[in-house]
Amino acid sequence: MTYNKETLKNAIVQKLRLNYGCTEQQATDGEMMKACAMVLRDIMAERGVQTREETAHEEKRKVHYLSLEFLMGRSLMKNAFNLELLDELTAAIGELGFRAADIFDMEPDAGLGNGGLGRLAACYLDSMTTLEIPAAGYSICYELGIFKQKIVDGQQVELPDDWLNLGDAWLMPKPQEAEEIHFGGRVRTRWDNGHLMVVHEDYTRVLAIPCDMLVAGYNTDHVNTLRLWDAKSPKPIDMQLFSQGQYLKANEERAMADSISTILYPEDNHYEGKSLRLKQQYFFVSATLQSITRQHIQTYGTLKNFHEKNVIQINDTHPALVIPELMRILIDDAGLSWDEAWDITRHSVAYTNHTVLAEALESWPQRLFETLLPRIWQIMQEIARRWQQKVDDFYHDPKKTEKMAVIWDGVVHMANLCIAGGMAVNGVSALHSDILRRDVFRDACGMEPDKFRNVTNGVDHRRWISQINPGLDGLIRDCIGDGYLTHAGRLSDLDRFAGDAAVLSRLEQIKGDNKQAFARWAKRQQGVTLNTDAIFNVQVKRLHEYKRQLLNVLHIISLYQQLQDDPNMDFRPQTFLFGAKAAPGYAVAKRIIRLINSLADQINSDPICRDKLQVVFLENYRVSMAEMLMPASEVSQQISTAGKEASGTGNMKFMMNGALTLGTLDGANVEMHQVLGDENMFLFGLTADEAARLRQSYDPHLLYTRDPVLHRVLDQLKTGFRDGVSYEDLYQRLLYGADCPADQYLLLADFASYCAASHRVVDTYADREKWNRMSLHNIARSGIFSADRSIADYADTIWHVPYKK
């Protein structure tokens, strides 16, 4: 069926009448948004049926992408764009008496992720669909998801984010496809005619109800699915207890089941929190694998060819239990031998690593497994025993055996489980993958070198250029056509316009318009007035010490002190924009947020800074905010300690929108530098190798005593600002350490270099032609960071599936 403005109008009116019992004149903005979503969902559902039939008929290998996060953002505009119906939908909404912009703004961000991990998964699902790869994403249908951030008295406060209130229009519940998950209990085993018989009894049951969210590809009828699992208790309320007035007790089991899918990353600094997190991970993995294997048996009648028709990509270690759970299904349910099951598993599962931080490599206490997952624990023990024997036979080195162990000294190491049970392990940037091979997983790489790969991250360039920055999209189309939407490498054709004054002038005008648009948004959303004549200098990302928001703050303090010393100095206006959420239990990160707000209050209220220096903390940073901010940004701060950031994807989105990078040679910045050169970005700081060498004899206090600028800046932390809050704890942490080495992320070591690079940024900005030319080169050379390229790499080197070229 062909859809146009009129057919969409009629379909929307029908949805309003049938689902809300109202006319278009009576409908609220929320009802209109949901009606539009339902219309697009119906179009995708029809195409999805056709996609699944083709996949089954042609017996194609299917990719299953498991991630505890999918940061989808808003879907109404995105799906309309991919279906190539955005103009028609916008017109239909307008003719029904609504402003399309208001309707799009009504949609909440889907609260299914926290940061880069979840946004990457969302971009990849889009590209898998656009490239017509049969695929499905799997996660948990979090009721509240990641928290909504509120800044109260300068401090982060976490509020529940009830995104499902309006976001459920995209979900298609499938209760008939529910799976049952077992926790606790005990396991009995016996041998019967050479077969191990396993009986799991006295367990607690939880139902996993699938809620499917359809994903449309661009310029294709192919539709894939994101399956989200909702946890429910199969037991009805205990009416006897309820009638006795024991209301909480009567609901106890239901509440425990519901808690599994309530919130993303519950705090785990206590036993109950750890237990809930492990329950979440097994719930999600077990439901997913039961669903996948059930569908496979329906199609092929056996699991012996499972690995030939399925590949399971796990996004970080959160879904690592897919390895023992697949073994359980193959052995206990399908009756295969251990060796048969292990061969299938080892050819089905691939693992993407996202961190080199030792503290972020996931591990669990053994007793949790023994209590919550007794059968999985038995299988884990056997995996660990066999893997340890393999390592012993290869290295004959007890230290290497300990380092590579799946289970050691009462602790389960999930990354080692992924290495032992997976067919491939990949990093997400060239530098990151090199560090994994040379350092983090050096011994495993020495034993199985062919298992280790690199697939540099990418982002959905259709969303992060064309959809969110229509002015830039128009310029690109006028210069090189629209072929870049499906072949991002064609953006390189823009390089030939670097000497075209009209193109550069138009690019500058687009950036100025986007700054004005973001300023209006910020005024409306946060009541802050931005100086649009200033450089928009932006750092937005999860708050973590290694990402070094604090280094940015130290530099801003130094600028403020310069203005205090000489209010009449020649000063290029700068507006520093921060956006970041801190994990609820991460006290240091929360202190840094408070420091940013203290500094903002001081600077923004000081007359000497007016129209010169401004600091703004953007509350509740999220995908929809990024979509407004990135087109308006001029400087992208990517300043993590070299060797600590796996890749980053925000750096790529800023690059695509023409912001210039101020950064270290870390993560994907290294590959950005390879295509841009020194002349099109602003590098500073130690390299990863230099940082590693410095740590052996690092004395931050020596830098403090020798550098008067740094000395004065750090002393300001102790003194604090006009709100009377002292940050001596951060001062002490940098100079003397606390629960960590002093200045473990080398802020002070890179401070002088960072300040010098920041000065180069300001000097270069004054030359508008040069700046605009650099901006154009950034856009032109960003095509390599398209998620389409990343997915093609996965398809070619790990999944071995065909895709649309």
For each feature predicted by the language model, list its residue ranges:
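A conserved ligand/cofactor-binding region detector
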Residues: M1-K805
